[in-house]
Amino acid sequence: MKVNLGCGNKLLKGYINLDKFEYYNCDVTHDLEKFPYPFKSNSIQEVLLSHVLEHIGQQPDTFINIMKELYRICKNQSLIIINVPHPRHEDFLSDPTHVRPITILGLSLFDKKLNEEWQKVGAANTPLGLIHNINFKRIID
């Protein structure tokens, strides 16, 4: 199963299209800051988050719960595709609905192997993957 989370007006064939607003007439209406998500554990093979993550999870606990839910619903070896604006680009800075910059390093905090490597060398990076039992691996920049 493939899901297009925060789809807005970009409804995709072959995906379950989910958005917070009924206005978009998507398959599922659900707020991504409300938990749990309406999917069974280990049921999703692909997640698309296109220009979504920067709009949700302003509070650290909420953002971590979003990551926990993504991890819960994904099968082993699932693919999560994330598109976000660069945090220093005018597109990010000028939109008042952008509440959190999303960076490669920030997402890497949820990679257990990197967490362990950082701990061995005394890096100051917070090992969120180890703390919250989330293990995402970055495969493409």
Question: PLM features: what roles do these ranges have?
Answer:
Residues 2-86:
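Conserved SAM-binding loop
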Residues 57-65, 69-71, 75, 79-141:
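S-adenosyl-L-methionine-dependent methyltransferase catalytic module, highlighting the catalytic core
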